[in-house]
Amino acid sequence: MKALIETADKKSERAFLVGVELRSQTSWDVADSLEELAELATTAGVEVVGQGIQRLEAPHSGTFIGAGKAEEFAKAAKEANADTILFDDELSGAQARNLEEIFGAKVIDRTALILDIFAQRARTREGKMQVELAQLQYLMPRLTRYWTHLSRQRGSTGSIGGEGEIGRAHV
């Protein structure tokens, strides 16, 4: 079973933490939550090298945080030699991919970090299988469009029949 965050390497991962303060939250809530995320990261064997908080009315659909703030945090993370970015909130698959492009580093949310801690601590065969199942259920919606280059069926624009069949010669 492969963990979401591979911490078995001799070199410890270095993480930059990102939190978002929404209108419904207080700055104390966000600070406490980031402190808890830092403790979770330490438990997973990750060294925290910095953090950033953005105040938002609502999360952005593409990057969760604004693109400008993402660039600012990416610069700070690079200066701190962070190789992992930990978000305090749950990210969609598209948001994580977009952020990985901006940061140039692995982007992980709180749920993935917690699943990794469980994976590291699982001892029994049943426990390991349950953690792996939870990890796969977490990853499944995030794998959308990862292997579209392998697709042989697709409909063309304006086609009435939708997706076509694969010819027997190709099978």
Task: Give the label of every model feature segment.
Residues 1-110, 114-116:
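N-terminal accessory targeting/assembly segments
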Residues 169-171:
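Conserved small/polar residues in nucleotide/adenosyl-binding loops
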Residues 60-61, 114, 125, 146, ...:
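Glycine-rich, flexible loop/turn motifs
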Residues 112-131:
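Short alpha-helix plus adjacent loop in nuclease-associated cores
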Residues 29, 72, 128, 132-135:
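Alpha-helical initiation/capping and key positions within long helical/coiled-coil segments
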Residues 130-133, 137-140, 144-147:
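Alpha-helical coiled-coil heptad-repeat register
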Residues 146-166:
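Internal, active-site/partner-interface "lid" segment
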